[in-house]
């Protein structure tokens, strides 16, 4: 099982990170221990959304989709209430 996930920075609320992994718990720990170049600047991070995929190819495609404008719109609709409460929308 592979996971596509969305992280939110606790130090900069409007900073979101999209990625995919096979081990979601371990990956979150890595992000919070500053082991990822893209996320070490805005630690700590919290998991706000994830989807499970049956294989790596599907997870990678879903991650790429979430990184384009149409995919971002879908995420914003799914997370609308949460993002509104966080004053991001």
Which residues fall in each region the model found?
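GIY-YIG nuclease catalytic motif and its immediate N-terminal context
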Residues: 1-37, 43, 50, 57-68, ...
């Amino acid at each position: 099982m592979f996971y596509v996930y969305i992280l939110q920075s606790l130090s900069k609320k409007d900073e979101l990170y999209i990625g995919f992994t096979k081990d979601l718990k371990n990956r979150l720990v890595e992000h919070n221990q500053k082991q990822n170049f893209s996320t070490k600047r805005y630690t700590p991070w919290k998991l706000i959304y994830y989807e499970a995929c049956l294989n790596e190819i599907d997870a990678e495609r879903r991650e790429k989709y979430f990184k384009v404008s149409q995919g971002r719109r879908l995420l914003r609709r799914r997370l609308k209430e949460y993002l509104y409460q966080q004053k991001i929308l």
